[in-house]
């Protein structure tokens, strides 16, 4: 069995992928923030370097890059790339 996650995309990640959101499936026993990022990098290698410096928000709370948390299919998940410009 697996969980399906809706991932909200913003800024550069949204531009590169061309969508506001995407869906990712992860096995139930692998439904963690680290595995989600790993799978995103595999499916979308063109955003891999941006993901390295992006923030992950789960249910509107930022998750530390070194914190691997369990995620559920009903969680709101967002990838927040760094803001650039001037």
UniProtKB/Swiss-Prot annotation:
Entry superkingdom: Eukaryota
GO biological process, one term: Mo-molybdopterin cofactor biosynthetic process
Compartments in which it is found: Cytoplasm
InterPro entries named among the record's database cross-references: Beta-grasp_dom_sf (IPR012675), MOCS2A (IPR044672), MOCS2A_euk (IPR028887), Mopterin_synth/thiamin_S_b (IPR016155), ThiS/MoaD-like (IPR003749)
GO CC terms in record: cytosol; molybdopterin adenylyltransferase complex; molybdopterin synthase complex
PTM entry text: C-terminal thiocarboxylation occurs in 2 steps, it is first acyl-adenylated (-COAMP) via the hesA/moeB/thiF part of mocs3, then thiocarboxylated (-COSH) via the rhodanese domain of mocs3.
SUPFAM superfamilies associated with the record: MoaD/ThiS
Residue numbers of Glycyl adenylate PTMs: 86
List of residues that carry 1-thioglycine: 86
Family: Belongs to the MoaD family. MOCS2A subfamily.
Protein name as catalogued: Molybdopterin synthase sulfur carrier subunit
Organism from which the protein derives: Dictyostelium discoideum
């Amino acid at each position: 069995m697996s969980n399906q996650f809706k991932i909200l995309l913003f800024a550069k990640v949204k531009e590169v992928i061309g969508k506001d959101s995407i869906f990712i499936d992860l096995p139930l026993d692998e439904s963690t923030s680290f595995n989600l990022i790993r799978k995103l990098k595999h499916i979308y290698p063109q955003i891999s370097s941006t993901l390295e410096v992006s923030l992950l928000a789960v249910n509107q709370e930022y998750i530390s890059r070194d914190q691997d948390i369990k995620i559920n299919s009903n969680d709101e998940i967002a990838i927040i790339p760094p803001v650039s410009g001037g």
